[in-house]
UniProtKB/Swiss-Prot annotation:
Its main location: cytoplasm. Keywords: Cytoplasm, Ribonucleoprotein, Ribosomal protein. It comes from Babesia bovis. InterPro entries: Ribosomal_eS1 (IPR001593), Ribosomal_eS1_CS (IPR018281), Ribosomal_eS1_euk (IPR027500). This is Small ribosomal subunit protein eS1. HAMAP family: Ribosomal_eS1_euk. Transmembrane segments: none annotated. Component of the small ribosomal subunit. Mature ribosomes consist of a small (40S) and a large (60S) subunit. The 40S subunit contains about 33 different proteins and 1 molecule of RNA (18S). The 60S subunit contains about 49 different proteins and 3 molecules of RNA (25S, 5.8S and 5S).
Length: 264
């Protein structure tokens, strides 16, 4: 009988089955901390690969940009039309300290403002804040009917449009160049810059729905940990005030006795 290979017996594959490793075992979670300007400080968590050799986990986190709705940061649904960008600048323990990196308005909000028979006016300018940030601010506004107007349309002439645009740029530069980044963000949340533009342009042509459409951070100053900690620490107004400590009656009586003894 000839000895040969049995063709019916199938060979097993080389290496066999590989073990399925869960990729999340090599990763860890970090908490995201928002600056003091917002009410909700812990706004989420982020995932990063664990430190392996010379590759540190913190290096993978620095510079990450997170886009969050202002409604989530301030716990107010009325502010859901604005999006805030926060950039991770430093890591302390398992906390990622973020700072403001820009803002924009949602598309559905912009589409809801567009109306028939009204003019749209836009302007933008580059501003440098007192703490060294260079911002590019975009403003948008719409014409408004004058009281008692009978005409159905509310269009603006190109000559007046140029004047309104000039006033928009002046207000944006005045409001942002004289304050720090922290104060600029505080002005954007309640739309106070838009209200100032409406007041300034009232004499030229009445405007409505004026708001800062977008802010881009073009240039940042050199990283300083102390300045970042100032943004993340809430300094109460009461610090630094002198407090008057009332003396007890016994202490006052002892003092008068000593003075009487010295005089005698």
């Amino acid at each position: 009988m000839a000895v040969g290979k049995n063709k019916r017996v199938s060979k097993g594959k080389k290496g066999g089955k590989k073990k399925i490793v869960d990729p999340f075992l090599k990763k860890e979670w970090y908490t995201l901390k928002a600056p003091v300007m917002f009410h909700v400080r812990n706004f989420g968590q982020t995932l990063v690969s664990k430190t392996q050799g010379t590759k540190l986990a913190t290096d993978g986190l620095r510079g990450r940009i997170y886009e969050v709705s202002l409604a989530d940061l301030n716990a107010d649904e009325d502010q859901s039309y604005r999006k805030i960008k926060l950039c991770c600048e430093d890591i302390q323990g398992r906390n990622c300290l973020t700072n403001f990196h820009g803002t924009s308005v949602t598309r559905d909000k912009l589409c809801s403002l567009i109306r028939k028979n009204y003019s749209l006016i836009e302007a933008f300018t580059d501003v440098k804040t007192t703490d060294g940030y260079t911002l590019r601010m975009f403003c948008i506004g719409y014409t408004k009917r004058r009281p008692g107007q009978l005409k159905s349309t509310c269009y603006i002439r190109s000559s007046r449009t140029r004047v309104v645009r000039r006033k928009m740029i002046e207000v944006m530069q005045r409001e942002a160049s004289t304050t720090s980044m922290r104060e600029v963000v505080k002005k954007i949340i309640p739309e106070s810059i838009g209200k100032e533009i409406e007041k300034a342009c009232k004499s030229v042509f009445p405007l409505q729905n004026v708001l800062i459409r977008k802010i881009k951070v073009l240039k940042k100053p050199k990283f300083d940990l102390t300045k970042l900690m100032e943004v993340h620490t809430d300094i109460s107004e009461e610090t630094g005030h002198a407090t008057k400590v009332e003396e007890s009656e016994e202490a006052a009586n002892l003092l008068t006795k000593e003075l009487d003894a010295q005089e005698a």
